[in-house]
């Protein structure tokens, strides 16, 4: 079986976003480490590697790298569907705003404390805020539906 090298399957959208050229996509630890090093070596606050080959695909799969602690402001996609987060490295909080604010602490398997989960699945129309609490974090975001920046609603604050 002829397996494609990771480097041969990368389409560089810009410095902060790379995408797979072909499917199926396979990544090993070395590939993920190479992506993380790209983010760190280029002083990128955030870096995203999209596993889908097209933003119009019905399933969006993104490896997201945060190079240092940071907060992604409140956002949602009112068109609906689901979004799933899985922490590969580090610790993040996913803060949800529904009737009340709820904080879900997610972490990789090294955080053996039972306070932490490693994954969460939530409706896309719920406002959420992502807070990276470790020096660096890597997490997988899987979202139903195609992706357009204009489908995301952003808020700086949830205060009325």
Model-identified regions with their sequence ranges:
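Short, solvent-exposed secondary-structure boundary motifs
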Residues: 39-43, 53, 74-76, 118-121
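Short beta-strand His + acidic residue motifs that chelate non-heme Fe in jelly-roll/DSBH
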Residues: 73-75, 94-96, 120-122, 128-133, ...
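A short, N-terminal "cap"/entry segment at the start of jelly-roll beta-barrel domains
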Residues: 1-59, 105-112
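A short beta-loop-beta micro-motif enriched in histidine and acidic residues
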Residues: 51-60, 70-86, 115
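Glycine- and acidic-residue-biased ligand/ion/polar-headgroup-sensing regions
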Residues: 67-68, 79-100
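Double-stranded beta-helix
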Residues: 99-115, 129-160
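Conserved hydrophobic/aromatic beta-strand scaffold that supports enzyme active sites
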Residues: 61-65, 84, 119-121
């Amino acid at each position: 079986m002829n397996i494609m090298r990771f480097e041969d399957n990368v389409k560089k959208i810009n410095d902060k976003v790379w995408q797979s050229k072909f499917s199926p996509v396979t990544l090993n630890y070395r590939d993920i480490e190479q992506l993380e090093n790209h983010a760190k070596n280029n002083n990128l606050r955030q870096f995203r590697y999209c596993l889908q080959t097209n933003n119009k695909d019905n399933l969006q799969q993104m490896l997201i790298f945060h190079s240092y602690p940071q907060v992604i402001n409140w956002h949602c996609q009112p068109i609906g569907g689901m979004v799933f987060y899985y922490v590969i490295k580090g610790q993040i909080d996913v803060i949800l705003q529904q009737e009340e604010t709820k904080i879900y602490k997610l972490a990789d398997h090294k955080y053996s404390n039972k306070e932490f989960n490693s994954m969460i699945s939530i409706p896309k129309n719920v406002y959420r805020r992502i807070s990276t609490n470790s020096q660096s974090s890597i997490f997988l975001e899987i979202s139903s539906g195609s992706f357009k920046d204009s489908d995301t609603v952003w808020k700086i604050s949830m205060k009325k």
